Curated annotation (Swiss-Prot):
InterPro entries: Ribosomal_uL13 (IPR005822), Ribosomal_uL13_bac-type (IPR005823), Ribosomal_uL13_CS (IPR023563), Ribosomal_uL13_sf (IPR036899). GO terms for cellular component: cytosolic large ribosomal subunit. This is Large ribosomal subunit protein uL13. GO terms for biological process: negative regulation of translation; translation. This protein is one of the early assembly proteins of the 50S ribosomal subunit, although it is not seen to bind rRNA by itself. It is important during the early stages of 50S assembly. Coiled coil: none annotated. Gene3D superfamilies: Ribosomal protein L13 (3.90.1180.10). GO terms for molecular function: mRNA binding; structural constituent of ribosome.
Length: 155
């Protein structure tokens, strides 16, 4: 039997909506990364964008386990300005309580996707919103109940 390789015209993309309220960040991010790549489909082809479109709502209510929200020794995100000595840091707690809490989910998923042109295309299929409203009702997304999939997914 020959190995099956999907063609771009054969790929069917679905729209999913996931409620992130009281869901553990790492578990959600790993599942979303799998769905964005299309690895949950039997027709997965590594060099094509065969993943689905994912809408995540209630990103401001995401949960982190352990001491990651602790301001002193919690999860730290680093970035660099490009100038000598230009390393900047911020904590997960500051981001979640700030203006754009959806960035925590976007960063977690982005770091689980391949770092190339295909990964950038797959990340463009992810839509994260801080509250429960989203402008994608015309696509008729299917509700994906991630929290009830495993008791460890919810905190």
């Amino acid at each position: 039997m020959k190995t099956y390789s999907a063609k771009p015209s054969e790929i069917e993309k679905k729209w999913w909506v996931i409620d992130a309220k009281n869901v553990v960040l790492g578990r959600l991010a790993s599942r979303v990364a799998i769905m964005l790549r299309g690895k949950h489909k039997p027709s997965f082809t590594p060099h094509l964008d065969c993943g689905d479109n994912i809408i995540i709502i209630n990103a401001e209510h995401i949960k982190l386990t352990g001491k990651k929200l602790n301001p002193k020794d919690g999860k730290v995100y680093y970035r660099h300005t490009g100038f000598p000595g230009g390393i900047k840091d911020t904590t997960a707690g500051k981001i979640l309580s700030g203006k754009y809490p959806e960035r925590v989910i976007k960063m977690a998923v982005k770091r689980m996707i391949t770092r190339n042109v295909l990964g950038a295309k797959q990340m463009s299929n992810l839509y994260v919103y801080a509250n429960c409203e989203h402008p994608h009702m015309a696509q008729q997304p299917t509700i994906y109940d991630f929290a009830s999939e495993n008791p460890k997914n919810k905190k």
